[in-house]
């Protein structure tokens, strides 16, 4: 699938590139897994509810999540830092 990063997601990704290679490795593993199957796999995929209906999250760790959606065979990454209710 094609990948698209929102400006916030790209800034978050660059933050991990510059600050923590361990987190970056985990994020890259999750991105690979999301590409294979957006709704199943590692990181406890969870469909979000209420005002985030249509979005999914995966755990990077206890604090940080990847938030993304799938639109027309394209994965759109929304964020890579913090929790989705920030």
Indicate where each model-derived feature is located.
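PIN-domain endoribonuclease scaffold, especially VapC-family toxins
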Residues: 24-32
């Amino acid at each position: 699938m094609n990948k698209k990063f929102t400006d916030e997601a790209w800034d978050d990704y660059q933050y991990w590139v510059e600050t923590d290679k361990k987190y970056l490795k985990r994020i890259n593993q999750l991105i690979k897994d999301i590409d294979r199957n957006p709704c199943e796999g590692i990181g406890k995929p969870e469909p979000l509810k209420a005002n985030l209906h249509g979005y999914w999250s995966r755990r990077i760790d206890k604090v940080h999540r990847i938030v993304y959606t799938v639109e027309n065979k394209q994965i759109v990454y929304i964020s890579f830092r913090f929790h989705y209710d920030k």
